[in-house]
Amino acid sequence: MMRNTLVLFLVGGLILVSCSTDKMDGTSADAIVGTWDLTALDIDQQTASDEEEFGQVILSELSAENCYLVSLTFNQDLSLITEDASNYLEIGVNAGGTGLEVPCPSQRDTETTTYTYSDGVLTFVDENQATVSLNVSIDGGTMIISAQELDVENFNAGGELIFSRR
């Protein structure tokens, strides 16, 4: 009798553990909640245009200084706050004339809208009141969006925009 009771508790415990919530995948509605900073532009080095390569270098330089041109905050209440400094980039040549000087923009445009995220598709209303739907890939703390689809000023020639969760 004691043995049957022990087996019953072990089986019951295993069932409870196996029925617990699984690890959240990148397509669940909660996977996108949080603040995401644009940290990189991933391009095909073999076929990339000069504009894509230039964008990649700029994002790399700014990210190394903890300066993020675009931040997206997805709230639990389905509001989306976008902070975008890409319109305020001032690119120059450094004092030695040997490379670029890209100071972190101090000015940002901030917009608030609503969004939905389901099965890897992000849908939101843009500043022109148009509904935009994008395919989004989320893997842990990394979110990837097509640069052409998101259409961030100066970074929309091609490639994939890489966002990192704060």
Q: Whereabouts are the PLM-identified features?
A:
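Lipid interaction determinants
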Residues: 20-166
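C-terminal motif of bacterial Sec signal peptides marking the signal peptidase cleavage site
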Residues: 15-18
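Positively charged n-region of N-terminal signal peptides that target proteins for export
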Residues: 1-6, 20
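N-terminal hydrophobic or amphipathic segments with adjacent small-residue motifs
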Residues: 6-7, 28
